[in-house]
């Protein structure tokens, strides 16, 4: 097989972009799914709506044969008409509940379709052990295979760059048009995702996932999980609704016996006609209407939609949640563990000043700093070289004979071993002090003065040395992102504690923490400290959220109740987390807490509204059953007739479900209030509103209906 330097462009898929949801098509599919969900095996999953489903079947049967459960006391044709109307309204009640769930599911499936569009059946060039290339289909690739990708070709699978540097277009996944530079040697920049496109140069990639197990495949399976497992709070609420439904079912089931008892008393006191009128008011269809009106059908019909919509709102932030449990956990978070760099401050710290110590000059510091940064390709390292060049410093070193020393979290320094045997280093001040002492050197007193000066300015001090002598301190300027103080204050009002982790010294960390407005901070933190902080918070009964992108973050991401991994991060980090941010913006963790709380607030608000509705429906239907028993005074709405009261209450009960679908999908407007303030506000708006709204609506429907 030939080994061309430029491989032929043989993908069978053109560049894809995430499409906008086709709302018309979404609603058409949702209407179709509403009928599919009428299947008993699907309907039984929602106990509240299943009662309505069974009630619809029963009222349909008594429409066909009004005497099915006993002789009808009223006019049989009028009874058949009433039964038919009740059946129709109950049918649409179930259909509207199915539609709400189908719309929420459809939005998730639309996202899955957009992710599927990034997958393409591509040709891969596999690098054989002898160095030659073999053309195979991407589905034949296996974990550990090495492939070659060139400019304009689609990357056929998830992998790690082991050779080459190139720009990759990840817009099909992230929506971000700016290309991302990929190169070997770092956790972040070496990770590539199948379905993205290489824009320039060539890359040698080692495949890290078998077909069907890549990042996109896993995300699709998660997003398509319409049959998702319910969250603990959702299960608890479902159980509560089921218990309420059973209570009302027992009450309504015993009502015929109670009515017969009263009818016998009325027959003796007022005659048989009054007794028969009372019995007619307790027909099977009317009792089912009372049951449907009393059970919490509104929240029962919207509960699944609220949960699915919560995941969809997260997806609109370009974040993939592995489960509804993760989204819900965001709302219960008590502590946020945040990295300083990239989350609280902008990621790229820039060299701003060289501060000489130990009688050296600024030029001396610039020269040593530049030598220590010759192999440092980070933005910080490049900014040090750029600042040194302002002093006309030339690095007269043969790079082929010099040796770069990479930064590590353990040593907390990097540098260069020069051809003449000298060692130049830059790094955290205490790390450089340790390096000097290990070589028998001494620490000049003005190092601490420079250290404190930079720290008090909120910058990061890096010491530079050659062998056993410190030459000076580099001032790396760090800028806190705007608006964070206000957002942290909002979180504080909601009872969420913010903890900043940084490798900076205590003074610098204190200045940054005060400027950003975080509640607590850990200075000179190592990656291992993250998991210790999380465990400490969890031992106090708190739920913890954190972000991470590197392999060393994976244990902490797995330990956290909510772990948000960056899409630009390593495969290990993404597998350990329960959320992945496609935009790789760690600040989004704050937004996710808001979304989680909004989900819980929406569920609670609509539950309150649904249960409060029962009061008005109670006063609409109950007087129609016991009117002959002399409790017509309970008809406080002045409804025209028994038939009008029943139909009005059921129409309202059905229409309120589609009316609340937008609120269920978009969520209740979030306000950063304390738990007590939120409770009082929701009881006032959705509790009191849930009582008043049906009184008004049922009366208006009664006025419009032609019953007399």
Curated annotation (Swiss-Prot):
Annotated GO CC locations: plasma membrane
Annotated Basic and acidic residues bias: 7-23
Enzyme class of the recorded protein, top EC level: translocase
Top-rank taxon: Bacteria
Entry keywords, A to Z: ATP-binding, Cell inner membrane, Cell membrane, Ion transport, Magnesium, Membrane, Metal-binding, Nucleotide-binding, Phosphoprotein, Potassium, Potassium transport, Translocase, Transmembrane, Transmembrane helix, Transport
EC identifiers of the protein: 7.2.2.6
Compartments where found: Cell inner membrane
Pfam family membership, one: Hydrolase
The keyword Transcription is annotated on this UniProt entry: no
Alphabetical list of PANTHER family matching this protein: POTASSIUM-TRANSPORTING ATPASE ATP-BINDING SUBUNIT
Assembly and interaction partners: The system is composed of three essential subunits: KdpA, KdpB and KdpC.
Xref: NCBIfam families: ATPase_P-type, kdpB
Name of protein: Potassium-transporting ATPase ATP-binding subunit 2
Protein source organism: Nostoc sp. (strain PCC 7120 / SAG 25.82 / UTEX 2576)
Taxon lineage: Bacteria, Bacillati, Cyanobacteriota, Cyanophyceae, Nostocales
Gene name of this polypeptide: kdpB2
């Amino acid at each position: 097989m030939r080994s061309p330097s430029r491989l032929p462009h043989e993908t069978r898929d053109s560049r894809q972009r995430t499409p906008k949801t086709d709302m018309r098509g979404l609603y058409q599919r949702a209407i179709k799914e509403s009928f599919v969900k009428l299947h008993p095996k699907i309907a039984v999953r929602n106990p509240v709506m299943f009662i309505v489903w069974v009630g619809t079947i029963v009222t349909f049967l008594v429409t066909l044969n009004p005497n099915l459960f006993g002789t009808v006391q009223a006019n049989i044709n009028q009874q058949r008409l009433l039964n038919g109307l009740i059946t129709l309204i109950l049918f649409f009640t179930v259909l509207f509940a199915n539609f709400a769930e189908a719309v929420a599911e459809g939005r998730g499936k639309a996202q899955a379709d957009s992710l599927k569009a990034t997958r393409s059946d591509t040709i891969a060039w596999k690098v054989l052990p002898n160095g030659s290339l073999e053309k195979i289909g991407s589905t034949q690739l296996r974990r550990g295979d090495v492939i070659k990708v060139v400019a304009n070709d689609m990357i056929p699978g998830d992998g790690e760059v082991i050779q080459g540097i190139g720009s990759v277009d990840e817009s099909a996944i992230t929506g971000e048009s700016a290309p991302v530079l990929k190169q070997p040697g770092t956790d972040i920049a070496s990770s590539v995702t199948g379905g993205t496109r290489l824009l320039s140069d060539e890359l040698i990639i080692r495949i890290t996932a078998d077909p069907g197990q890549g990042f996109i495949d896993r995300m699709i399976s998660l997003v398509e999980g319409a049959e998702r497992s319910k969250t603990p709070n959702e299960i608890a609420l479902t159980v509560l609704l089921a218990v309420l439904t059973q209570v009302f079912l027992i009450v309504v089931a015993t009502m015929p016996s109670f009515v017969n008892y009263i009818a016998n008393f009325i027959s003796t006191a007022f005659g048989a006609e009054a007794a028969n009128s009372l019995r007619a008011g307790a027909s099977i269809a009317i009792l089912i209407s009372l049951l449907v009106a009393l059970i919490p059908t509104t929240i029962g019909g919207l509960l699944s939609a609220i949960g699915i919509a919560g995941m969809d709102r997260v997806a609109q932030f370009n974040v993939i949640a592995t489960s509804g449990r993760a989204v819900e956990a965001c709302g219960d978070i008590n502590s946020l563990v945040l990295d300083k760099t990239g989350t609280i401050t902008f990621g790229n710290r820039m060299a701003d000043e060289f501060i000489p110590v130990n009688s050296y000059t600024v030029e001396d510091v610039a020269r040593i700093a530049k030598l220590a940064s010759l192999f440092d390709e980070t933005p910080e390292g490049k900014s040090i070289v750029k600042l040194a060049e302002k002093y006309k410093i030339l690095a007269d070193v043969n790079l082929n004979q010099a040796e770069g020393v990479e930064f590590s979290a353990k040593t907390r320094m990097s540098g260069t071993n020069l051809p003449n045997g000298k060692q130049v280093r830059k790094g955290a001040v205490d790390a450089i002090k340790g390096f000097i002492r290990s070589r028998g050197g001494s620490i000049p007193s003005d190092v601490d003065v420079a250290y404190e000066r930079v720290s008090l300015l909120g910058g990061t001090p890096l010491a530079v040395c050659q062998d056993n002598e410190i030459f000076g301190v580099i001032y790396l300027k760090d800028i806190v992102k705007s608006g964070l103080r206000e957002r942290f204050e909002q979180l504080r009002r909601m009872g969420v504690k913010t903890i900043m982790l940084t490798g900076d010294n205590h003074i610098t960390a204190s200045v940054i923490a005060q400027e950003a407005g975080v509640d607590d901070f850990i200075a000179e933190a190592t990656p291992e400290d993250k998991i210790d902080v999380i465990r400490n918070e969890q031992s106090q009964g708190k739920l913890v959220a954190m972000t991470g992108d590197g392999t060393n973050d994976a244990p902490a991401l797995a330990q956290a109740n909510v772990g948000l991994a960056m899409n630009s991060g390593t495969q290990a980090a993404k597998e350990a987390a329960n959320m992945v941010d496609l935009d790789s913006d760690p600040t989004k963790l704050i937004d996710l807490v808001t979304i989680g709380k909004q989900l819980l607030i929406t569920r609670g608000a609509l539950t309150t509204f649904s249960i409060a509705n029962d009061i008005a429906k109670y006063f609409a239907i109950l007087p129609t059953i016991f009117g002959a028993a002399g409790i017509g005074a309970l008809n406080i709405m002045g409804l025209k007739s028994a038939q009008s009261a029943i139909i009005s209450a059921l129409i309202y009960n059905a229409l309120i479900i589609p009316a609340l679908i937008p609120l269920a999908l978009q969520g209740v407007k979030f306000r950063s209030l304390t738990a007590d303030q939120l409770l009082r506000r929701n009881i006032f708006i959705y509790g009191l509103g849930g009582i008043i709204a049906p009184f008004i609506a049922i009366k208006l429907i009664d006025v419009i209906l032609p019953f007399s």
